[in-house]
Regions:
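The conserved beta-strand core of Leucine-Rich Repeat
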Residues: 1-327
């Protein structure tokens, strides 16, 4: 759709012929998909406003894509919200795209229990990158149940996922951890939010010991049951660092986190001392505590030694989240 907008901008005389694309579903895209003999890559990114639509503008597109399931290995979609229209077809047919290597969905799609069961049954032998935003963890867990053997990257913005949980976060995050270590032995990049319960930490440590190829973690420890004290927040950070040391992740090169847990100066130094024989670490955080002088001195010390490769603080959550550059 971006190309169409640019065409109208640079060639005003084209507007009369193309303006209908803004007021009704674009069935021409569906026809274009239908004539492709070996369609492997499909990407849709909405950036226009739809007005007065009475039918789903994407239905015919998905029906056409469904017929290309035997060849399609890259699917990326971002749809804008359209008042009065529920997008339901993608959820119904997603389990049929068994050849996918990359699946990216940057929008909320509600999945019924029946649709989740279909996802669990589908085997995605070739799936390597899974990026689903604005959805519950059980959607991702369902996809990897029989399709995680080749997965190298499971990426999402943790806070957006947590916002969708509505009281099911503790249960779903625990199940998510288990599905990862049961089904994703090759995982390298992983977004992972979980509760600071003893059971969650135990399962997370098990994940780290099984998934030895991990290179990067985006971590969120979120207590949905109560507001934690500062002592509890530091305690979660200390437990996490001890787990990382015990896990002996020789390939781990990067840790990303926000400010939902903190490392005391003493715990961080102990961790870095014990990390000396492993890979150089890059650390990215939005927590301004690490801008304090005593933390900066400690970080610079271990940069000079060669244990820390890079330490970046940013108030922009978008710079801590994974972005599409690593896809």
């Amino acid at each position: 759709m971006k190309l169409i907008k640019h065409q109208i901008f640079y060639f005003p005389e084209a507007k009369i012929r193309l303006e209908s694309l803004y007021s009704k579903p674009n069935h021409g895209i569906a026809k274009l998909i239908e004539v492709q003999r070996n369609l492997k890559h499909f990407e849709w990114n909405d950036d226009i406003d739809y007005d007065y639509l009475t039918e789903d503008p994407y239905e015919k597109i998905f029906l056409a894509l469904e017929k290309k399931a035997d060849s399609l290995n890259y699917l990326r979609v971002y749809f804008q919200y359209i008042e009065g229209i529920d997008h339901i077809l993608l959820q119904q047919i997603l389990s049929k795209f068994y050849k996918l290597k990359i699946l990216i969905i940057d929008d909320f799609f509600f999945f019924t229990e029946e649709q989740l069961e279909k996802l669990k049954l589908q085997v995605y032998n070739d799936l390597e990158i899974l990026n689903i935003e604005w959805n519950k963890l059980n959607v991702i867990s369902s996809i990897i149940e029989n399709g995680g053997r080749s997965l190298k990257k499971i990426l999402f913005r943790p806070y957006d996922i947590i916002e969708c949980e509505y009281g099911s976060f503790n249960k779903n995050s625990l199940n998510f951890i288990r599905k990862i270590y049961e089904n994703c032995p090759s995982i390298e990049y992983l977004s992972i939010p979980f509760s600071p319960s003893k059971e969650h930490f135990t399962e997370f440590e098990k994940l780290l010991k099984i998934c030895k190829n991990l290179k990067s973690l985006l971590l969120v420890i979120c207590n949905m049951d109560k507001i934690e004290t500062i002592e509890e927040i530091y305690e979660s950070g200390e437990i996490l660092l001890k787990i990382l040391i015990r896990s002996e992740l020789i390939n781990l090169k990067e840790i990303r986190f926000y400010d939902d847990f903190k490392f005391s100066l003493e715990s961080l130094e102990e961790f870095l001392e014990k990390w000396f024989d492993k890979s150089k670490l890059s650390i990215f955080t939005s927590d301004s505590i690490y801008e304090e002088e005593n933390y900066k001195n400690l970080i610079n010390k271990y940069k000079r030694i060669g244990i820390i490769k890079d330490f970046k603080h940013s108030l922009l959550i978008s710079e801590i989240n994974y972005n599409f550059n690593i896809l």
